[in-house]
């Protein structure tokens, strides 16, 4: 199948909300069949998640309160990528800020594109 036949083209775009962390946009798009439709989506700067293994082989987790669900969770260290920041620098910074640990060795494990599911 030719993927080009699936592409939606942006006709217009407007901000709905601009916050400190994320931005909500509403776009009017031209569908492959020629009709138009609205798409609402969230722009996020990206984030890293750190899978830190201690010398004893245990994984490092932290407890975080998440306001949106009013609960404390056990989570892997993570954080958003600042503008112009390399993801590895973000990972180093977040590990140090959130846990007090620094890693002597880093290995990139992969990338997940979460925004495709919004």
Go through the PLM ranges and name each one.
Residues 23, 45-46, 53, 66, ...:
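Active-site segment of metal-dependent pyrophosphate-handling enzymes
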Residues 1-17:
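Extended interaction-bearing regions that mediate binding to partners or small molecules
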């Amino acid at each position: 199948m030719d993927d080009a036949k699936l592409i939606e083209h942006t006709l217009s775009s407007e901000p709905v909300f601009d916050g400190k962390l994320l931005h909500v946009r509403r776009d009017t798009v031209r569908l492959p069949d020629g009709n138009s439709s609205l798409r609402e989506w969230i722009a996020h700067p990206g984030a890293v998640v750190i899978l830190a293994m201690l010398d004893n082989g245990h994984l490092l987790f932290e407890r975080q309160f998440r306001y949106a669900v009013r609960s404390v969770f056990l989570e892997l260290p993570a954080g958003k990528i600042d503008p112009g920041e390399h993801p590895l620098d973000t990972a180093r910074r977040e590990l140090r800020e959130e846990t007090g640990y620094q890693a002597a060795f880093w290995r990139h494990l992969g990338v997940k594109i979460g925004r495709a599911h919004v």
